Amino acid sequence: MSLQLEKNLILELIPHFYSLGWMKFGSGNFCLKNNGYAICVKDRVQRDFITENDIVTFNLSNQSVTKDLVNWAYIFSWVLSNMDAVACIYSTSVAAVGASMYNEKFTTQSKEMIKGIPKGNPSAGYLCCFDTLEVPIIHNGDSKTILDELKKVIELYPQTCAVLIRGHGVIGWGATWEKSKTQMECYEYLFELDYKLKTL
């Protein structure tokens, strides 16, 4: 996909993610990989009114200039470079924050949308709806702390495609932009369902 097409995709999808409650108050992001570069939007920009001027492109191997515009530049770069990912989504939804309040991991089983989550490697297929899904949880902090915690927890959960950040939200990734989107839809559905079942 060309750089311009990816920019157009960001301009279309981020307002959509905003409408779902994933990216309120200028937070959250959708980051795409294009060869050795990453593309996302600036921090603290209204996600429902983004323009092409709000889009940032940075080198995956050198994010120092970009960090002032995108605080999570190092995190996005690491995920896109190390997790066989083409796209990642950072959501600060109410459901994700609620799911992040468990001790060490969010766990759910025997739910239909579990089958939308892959078994780690894209070639390994998908989970069954009767499987148990585990999403690890790390502590919140500055971007360096989150990245350090992310690296550690992925060593413990190498098959995961998402990590919750306590009191903050979730980051998820996929082998294509379509998979990152549909996987996050499944995660968000499961997070919200868990919350609603617990409040019955």
Swiss-Prot record:
GO terms for cellular component: cytoplasm. GO terms for biological process: L-methionine salvage from methylthioadenosine. Pfam families: Aldolase_II (PF00596). SUPFAM superfamilies: AraD/HMP-PK domain-like (SSF53639). GO terms for molecular function: methylthioribulose 1-phosphate dehydratase activity. Belongs to the aldolase class II family. MtnB subfamily. This is Methylthioribulose-1-phosphate dehydratase-like protein. It comes from Schizosaccharomyces pombe (strain 972 / ATCC 24843) (Fission yeast).
